[in-house]
Design a protein with these regions (language model features):
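Intracellular loop-helix junctions on the cytosolic face of multi-pass helical membrane proteins
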Residues: 1-75, 79-80, 84, 223-260
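Transmembrane alpha-helical segments of major facilitator superfamily
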Residues: 6, 91-100, 192, 232, ...
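C-terminal ends and interior cores of transmembrane alpha-helices
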Residues: 125-140
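Hydrophobic core of transmembrane alpha-helices in multi-pass small-molecule transporters
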Residues: 61, 143-160, 166
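Juxtamembrane helix-start elements in MFS-like secondary transporters
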Residues: 84-93, 145, 222-225
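Helix-to-loop junctions at the C-terminal end of transmembrane segments
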Residues: 102-118
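Loop-to-transmembrane helix entry/capping segments in MFS-fold secondary transporters
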Residues: 86-87, 174-191
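Residue-level signature of mid-helix packing/kink "hotspots" within the transmembrane helices
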Residues: 97-105, 197
Length: 260
């Protein structure tokens, strides 16, 4: 029903946005003989020895954990803090993901004008504003939260469009394209899964320790839920924005392969 239609619409919007994405130039890397290759275990660890990749990965991890926390706690926040119904929660999800997909062409235009890093920074700051607003919501303010879902979904578009492009650019300029790009992608995918694991594995026990249990109506417990759902991601997003600005934008020696 509603959810299937929303997923189909989101996939269609994402496909249309992908069609507008710029294609990176293809460069055929020379194939080395077996005698010229490093051992496989060294190839696996090679990305972590590269300062540009470590810097980008640090920003990606901090930002990813900040984004994963609301995703892990959204159902509890909507049900217990906002007193939202199941259809309203379904609508929140529809608005969030459709907004994220539809915002990607706009973010691509921002990238063309201001660059990848500054576009990502703008997305982070938009997300901080959304989370700060969400922290102040009270029970019954579902319309305001729907607006937040649209805006935070738009911020999600930057997370979908920019980090992967930065990684692809880094791989290309480091000379690993076609030779060792699998190692870079492997560490990147591991970081993605680590973001989700840390968000759920840390925040749920923390909420229980703070006195919140699903279905709780205690005002203090619900206030603490709002803090963890919204203010903790704000702090992490601001830290990620600082790292992005410090390591990738204003560094005296911009890491080759990251800054276009």
């Amino acid at each position: 029903g509603t959810m299937r239609g929303a997923c189909a619409l989101a996939l269609l919007a994402g496909w249309l946005a992908l069609g507008q994405a710029p294609r990176p130039p293809f460069s055929a890397a020379p194939q080395e003989g077996h005698e010229g290759r490093e051992p496989r275990y060294r190839q696996l660890w090679l990305p972590l020895t590269q300062a540009p990749f470590r810097r980008l990965l640090a920003v990606f991890l901090c930002n990813g954990i900040a984004s994963a926390i609301p995703a892990a706690l959204m159902l509890f926040f909507a049900q217990d803090r906002l007193q939202a119904t199941s259809p309203q929660i379904a609508l929140f999800l529809v608005l969030y993901f459709v907004s994220g997909a539809l915002s990607m062409p706009g973010w691509l235009r921002v990238v063309r004008r201001f660059g990848l890093e500054r576009a990502w920074l703008a997305g982070m700051l938009l997300a901080v504003a959304c989370f700060g607003w969400a922290a102040a919501l009270q029970g019954g303010q579902v319309a305001a939260f729907a607006v937040i879902c649209v805006l935070s979904g738009a911020a999600l578009g930057a997370d979908l469009a920019v980090p992967g492009a930065l990684l692809a650019l880094l791989i290309e300029r480091s000379g690993a394209q076609g030779t060792n790009d699998g190692a870079y992608l492997g560490w990147w995918n591991l970081a993605t899964k680590l973001n989700l694991a840390l968000a759920a594995g840390a925040t749920l026990p923390l909420l229980q320790w703070l006195g919140y249990l699903p279905g709780s109506q205690d005002p203090l417990a619900l206030q603490r839920l709002a803090w963890i759902y919204a203010l903790l991601p704000c702090a992490l997003k601001l830290m990620a924005a600082w790292l992005l600005h410090r390591l990738l934008i204003t560094s005296r020696n911009p890491p080759q392969g990251v800054t276009p």
